[in-house]
């Protein structure tokens, strides 16, 4: 008989099995479930080295199967400044400055989850707003849906799009009446020139289009990218995801 390495008991287990939708205990050996049932059924699988956890009535679910993920970009995103809940210049400016100071060699400071109404209801975010927050380092803010980004003046200049650029249908570098970019960039092709300023060179999102790095990454870059992927997987596991569907990729990512 195989003894359990782990037993969880006194739980409310949702089995997803129509024949037995609920149970109160389960046993694990190695990385596999070996039994699901009630306390009396599972107790006999305990050995002297079995870890026994009293769930105290808490719910236990099967691992979640995630349906659509971009793991490399998501792992990279864990390093970025999160702006969820940030409103107005008074809140934004100190966060951006601290982020810049903590990343002195980064070619582009990227912030995630920026509110479309960051500077107030109905007020379109512009490069001038971002220049007030941080004028001396390239900055780009991404909306939560990743369909819009906003960049400050120095970022637009270095990306070569301050005077605008031709874009595919559906993508736009939004222009002001004076013929200069406002800072609003609609869809990925519009903000891709700014993303290219990243110190990483954008290896983390090449898989969106199945592209490979133009120059083979060196050992240090590979180690950094492997760490990024590992951090992404650990983040998923911490929230109960045991399987994911990675919706982008290339041979470089596959090799990692």
Listing of model-derived features with the role each one plays in the protein:
Residues 3-9, 14, 18-256:
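Divalent metal-binding segments
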């Amino acid at each position: 008989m195989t003894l359990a390495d782990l037993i969880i008991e006194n739980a409310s287990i949702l089995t997803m099995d129509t024949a037995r939708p609920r149970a109160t205990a389960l046993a694990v050996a190695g990385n596999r479930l070996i039994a699901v049932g009630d306390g009396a059924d599972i107790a006999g699988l305990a050995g002297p080295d079995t870890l026994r956890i009293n769930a105290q009535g808490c719910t236990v679910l099967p691992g979640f199967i995630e349906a659509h993920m971009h793991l490399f970009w998501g792992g990279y995103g864990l390093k970025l400044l999160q702006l969820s809940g940030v409103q107005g210049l008074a809140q934004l400016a100190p966060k951006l400055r601290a982020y810049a100071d903590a990343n002195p060699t980064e070619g582009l400071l990227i912030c995630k989850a920026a509110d479309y109404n960051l500077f107030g209801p109905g007020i379109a975010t512009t490069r001038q707003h971002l220049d007030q927050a941080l004028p001396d380092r390239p900055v780009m803010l991404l909306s939560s849906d990743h369909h819009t980004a906003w960049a400050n003046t120095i970022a637009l200049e270095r990306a070569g799009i301050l005077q605008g650029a031709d874009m595919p249908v559906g993508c736009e570098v939004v222009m002001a009446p004076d013929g200069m970019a406002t800072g609003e960039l609609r869809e990925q092709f519009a903000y891709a020139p700014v993303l290219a300023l990243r110190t990483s060179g954008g290896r983390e999102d090449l898989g969106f289009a199945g592209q490979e790095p133009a120059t083979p990454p060196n050992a240090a870059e590979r180690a950094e990218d492997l760490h990024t992927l590992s951090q992404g997987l650990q983040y998923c596991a911490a929230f109960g995801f045991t399987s994911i569907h990675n919706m982008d990729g290339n041979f470089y990512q596959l090799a990692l």
